[in-house]
Amino acid sequence: MANALAGNRIMCITWIAPDEYAATKLRDTVDDSIEFVRNSTPQEGPMRMIHSFFSEGPEYEMSESWIEGKHPPKTGRVILNLYEIYATEEGLDLAWVEAAEWFPTLAEMLEEFKIEMTVANQLSITHNLWD
């Protein structure tokens, strides 16, 4: 059903690691947090997490190659994304509070390995095609 997720809240964290070694360190940190998130996040009710996924791939140079069906050259950096969808704003707020204990470790790792981080938080889903 189209737009079944409309109105739900999403958070997206994008990390850009300068190389594969730094990306591996970030992957290890994410792997360490998965069980914590699984056990601390509501799976039912208005505060529930609807979906979460982690994706990654190489960073590519900006180029028109994509519209020609070709891949442009890779930069050597690695892009990693974490997406979490929650039923409500309050559910996403709770997720941040619950994750606070991980922030010092994450901040230290980002600084040590020179990993860039961008957060888009409390975005409201406006359209989705399929569930």
Task: Name each region found by the language model.
Residues 1-98, 111-131:
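Short S/T/G/P-rich N-terminal loop/turn motif that feeds into the first structured element of a domain
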